[in-house]
Amino acid sequence: SIKNQYNVCVERSKQFLNWRYTNRPDVKYFLFEYYQDNKIVGYSVLKKYKEKKITRGHIIDVFYNKKILNLFDFIIKSNCNFLYKNNCQEIELWLQGDTVAVNKLNKFNFYVKSTRPLIGKKLLMEEKLFKNLNKNKWYFTMGDTLEIY
């Protein structure tokens, strides 16, 4: 399953995604699903907003099956095309924990504007499980924070 690609990530169930994005009356999100053989193999959530004279597009969330060659490329190109057609001058996203995707974003001329340290604390977990967690397999996007507006 797609969610098993990471040690730690938000559970992206249908109920959660509807609560987080589609049932929000205060913000308009654009949701895209990607299929292969009639099965969802990825999705992305976009938002646009105006700040001063700039219209920005945010790729709020992107989740995909890493085993499908070029799926991430297709998602990002499709998202950029959609945002461009909707008059966005800049595109931003946060992506923590997927180095392959970050490398591909660099090839698409995205650049790192700032970084945020990943800080974690063990609460109720066996020590051996905690030691086996790999910070590079903690997956976070802009949609996993409270900072989206």
Each model region followed by its residue ranges:
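Active-site/acyl-donor-binding loops of N-acyltransferases
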Residues: F30, Q36, V45-N70, F74-Y149
